[in-house]
């Protein structure tokens, strides 16, 4: 089972109801980041119902026209030199923050290879520290999974002045590991999606004006 201090949420929550009142006493929600923390740690048997709204996803054109928001973030430490060098080469000439973010994502998607490094996979080390990110961006082959690519892109975005963070969550996948809605069921106006541990993944979130 999932054991973590962060409670899985979807969209902007308007209410969260726990099956037992004692669980509700250990719950905190940040409306700005739309994230929830559960200091008692999640464990088997924990049950809760979230009611909320999924924000509208902006179109590619809307993203491209958006400027980067002005948000104060802690300075990233021990960042490999290749991060700023590659980010500048890819998107340093973009006038809009949204365009720069898209350029980074497109380049990593086009140039990189995906591998978890499991048995039968192409060799790929776990982790997202200084050495691993340098290996990903400046090594002989760009190979990694969502952990490495999300960390690398977040650092590259920061180097260009784009406020960014790495989010950990769930994306429903089919048996081939591709994003799919095969486990999504509609019941009238409600939609239910079942997730498993294999659906855990990481992605980058960049704050743009208006989104």
Residue ranges of predicted features:
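Acidic low-complexity segments
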Residues: 17-141
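Residues at beta-strand starts and edge strands
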Residues: 1, 44-48, 200-202
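Beta-strand-rich, non-transmembrane domain signature
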Residues: 1-24
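Soluble extracytoplasmic regions of secretory-pathway and membrane proteins
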Residues: 2-9, 36-37, 41, 149
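Short, contiguous acidic/charged loop-to-helix segments that flank catalytic cores in large enzymes
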Residues: 135-144, 191-195
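Short intrinsically disordered, low-complexity coil segments enriched in acidic
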Residues: 1-7, 53-56, 211
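Hydrophobic/aromatic-rich core segments of domains that either
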Residues: 147-211
